[in-house]
């Protein structure tokens, strides 16, 4: 009897061991990827902005063209296109593709999407990019040919059409009643992209399955789950526990944690080339920053090299200008604002701001107190604003920090109720043309840059130069115009360039056969990812 009991126990132990091994292998499925994100995914609407997330929209929906490596515009839903000699007419030959519900993608569907994006009630949301302002007409010539006519030649047209939003295409079955996707949410997120929404739970997760009817090369992965984890430490703990496979993006974990992972042989860490610029925007509409001397003093009061080295642990490089010199038309030969706290103090004193008994500067009864909001879910943003708070206390400036959820942060920015705020250049394919266009545009949904700059004496000249450059066919004149704008912005000192941003990735050694960065920072590199064989992944 005892022997039988021992045999039974041994059998049960073997079953338990097998189950554990299977569970471990299941967590390393070669066709499944689990990642973490800091914000909810929104409504998965291709035409809206916040709260919808770029990475989600890019997975489900496609445009006529897409942004490829080294800035090359590649075919997407348009197989090819022709541009008229005068640069005003674009004719797109559409590929025979299927939406994820099996319906056909065609020129009539393109027109229907254009109709809602650029309707009279909605186009004001999109005048931050110049294509909206230049669009004269569009029409379906036949089932697979779509024509766009512009008011003037606009050389960045294909770059605007490659943007992740808003010019991406929703299937007919996804449109709400009345077709207004800005006013109403989509009935169902149906696109032609590589991924189909399988299941989602607000503020928890969203799971995608591979679009098996995709017109192009299918991803190696079959399923992707994005888990919503607002806290950086929670994301790191989930990764270490094996609950997520990949950390990819900007600000998702603290840089201290990233450095620890880089030293641990269990993990593979990587840093992309610079993709955009991290900026501090000074609101010149606020009384404290109406004096250019104060804005220039603040530019002298930021040790960018220290920020790059200590806050970003060398994963980002110090930025002296709004765009890196590798950005087209951006090398304007500007003289950087040197870090010099004494010079900053002298400039503030010359501007009439004197220290009181508490060590805080004041002028005409007004304290030099700055309201600085930041996004609570971004670990590096918190580190940055706390650095400003401590550094500027030496100058006699009282910095008041306010933590906000991301949606609230940008909603507040659109009202102009801030003294300073962290913002960013947009990276490819938006820099410099679309980013500069936004400086000129009073879009219906608001632009903090436009609000912050509108009181500048040079604002009219900045707008004129940008609008002229956007429709200038001569590349040398375009280059000259953009450099003049950058020189004016540099002199006005409304931006403090901080660092050139990169994307980081972290994963367990042996988990991936292929892994690389996407060409733009607002997309996931899912089309480039292949996981290793399950036995190899489990072994590591």
Place the predicted regions along the sequence by residue.
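N-terminal lobe/hinge region of extracytoplasmic solute-binding protein
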Residues: 36-85, 115, 190-191
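Ligand-site clamp/hinge motif
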Residues: 183-186, 210-257, 386-389, 398-400, ...
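Structural transition elements
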Residues: 283, 318-356, 376-383
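Surface-exposed binding/hinge segments that line
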Residues: 129-174
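Detector for C-terminal structural segments
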Residues: 201, 301-332, 380-389, 412-540
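Ligand/substrate-recognition segments at binding pockets and active sites
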Residues: 202, 354-428, 503
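Gly/Pro-rich hinge or "lid" segments in bacterial periplasmic/extracellular proteins
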Residues: 163-219, 223, 341-342, 346, ...
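Aromatic- and charge-enriched surface segment that lines or borders ligand/interaction sites
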Residues: 79-123, 147, 238, 288-290
């Amino acid at each position: 009897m005892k022997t039988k009991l021992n045999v039974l126990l041994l059998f049960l132990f073997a079953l338990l061991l097998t189950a554990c091994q299977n569970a471990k292998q299941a967590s390393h499925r070669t066709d499944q990827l689990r990642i973490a994100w800091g914000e909810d995914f929104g409504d998965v609407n291709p035409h809206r902005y916040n709260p919808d997330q770029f990475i989600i929209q890019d997975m489900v929906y496609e445009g006529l063209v897409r942004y490829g490596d080294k800035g090359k515009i590649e075919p997407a839903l348009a197989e090819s296109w022709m541009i008229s000699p005068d640069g005003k007419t674009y004719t797109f030959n559409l590929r025979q593709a299927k939406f994820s519900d099996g319906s056909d993608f065609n020129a009539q569907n393109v027109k229907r999407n254009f109709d809602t994006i650029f309707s009279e009630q909605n186009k004001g949301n999109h005048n931050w990019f110049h294509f909206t302002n230049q669009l004269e007409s569009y029409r379906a010539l036949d089932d697979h040919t779509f024509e766009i006519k512009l008011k003037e030649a606009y050389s960045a047209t294909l770059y605007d059409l490659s943007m992740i939003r808003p010019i991406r295409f929703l299937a007919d079955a996804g449109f709400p009643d009345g077709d207004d996707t800005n006013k109403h949410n989509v009935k169902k997120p149906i696109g032609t992209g590589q991924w189909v929404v399988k299941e989602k739970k607000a503020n928890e997760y969203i799971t995608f399955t591979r679009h098996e009817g995709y017109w192009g090369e299918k991803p190696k992965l079959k399923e992707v789950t994005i888990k919503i984890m607002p806290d950086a430490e929670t994301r790191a703990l989930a990764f270490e526990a094996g609950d997520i496979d990949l950390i990819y993006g900007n600000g998702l974990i603290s840089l201290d944690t990233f450095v620890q992972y880089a030293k641990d042989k269990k993990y593979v860490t990587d840093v992309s080339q610079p993709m955009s610029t991290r900026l501090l925007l000074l609101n010149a509409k606020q009384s404290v920053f109406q004096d250019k001397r104060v804005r220039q003093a603040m530019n002298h009061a930021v040790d960018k090299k220290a920020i790059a080295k200590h806050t970003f642990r060398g994963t980002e490089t110090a930025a002296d200008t709004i765009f890196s010199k590798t950005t087209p038309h951006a090398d304007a030969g500007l003289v950087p604002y040197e870090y010099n706290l004494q010079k900053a103090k002298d400039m503030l004193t010359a501007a009439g701001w004197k220290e009181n008994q508490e060590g805080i500067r004041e002028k005409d009864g007004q304290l030099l107190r700055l309201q600085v909001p930041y996004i609570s879910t971004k670990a590096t943003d918190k580190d940055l604003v706390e650095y400003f708070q401590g550094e500027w206390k030496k100058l006699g400036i009282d910095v008041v920090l306010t933590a906000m959820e991301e949606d609230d942060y940008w909603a507040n920015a659109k009202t102009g109720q801030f003294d300073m705020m962290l913002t960013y250049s947009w990276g490819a394919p938006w820099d410099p043309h679309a980013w500069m266009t936004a400086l000129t545009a009073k879009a219906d949904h608001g632009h903090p840059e436009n609000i912050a700059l509108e009181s500048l004496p040079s604002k009219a000249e900045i707008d004129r130069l940008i609008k002229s450059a956007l429709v200038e066919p001569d590349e040398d004149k375009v280059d000259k115009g953009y450099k003049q704008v950058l020189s004016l912005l540099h002199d006005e000192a409304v931006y403090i360039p901080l660092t050139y941003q990169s994307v980081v990735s972290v994963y367990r050694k042996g988990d991936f056969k292929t892994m690389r960065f996407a060409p733009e920072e607002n997309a996931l590199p899912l089309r480039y990812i292949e996981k290793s064989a399950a036995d190899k992944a489990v072994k590591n």
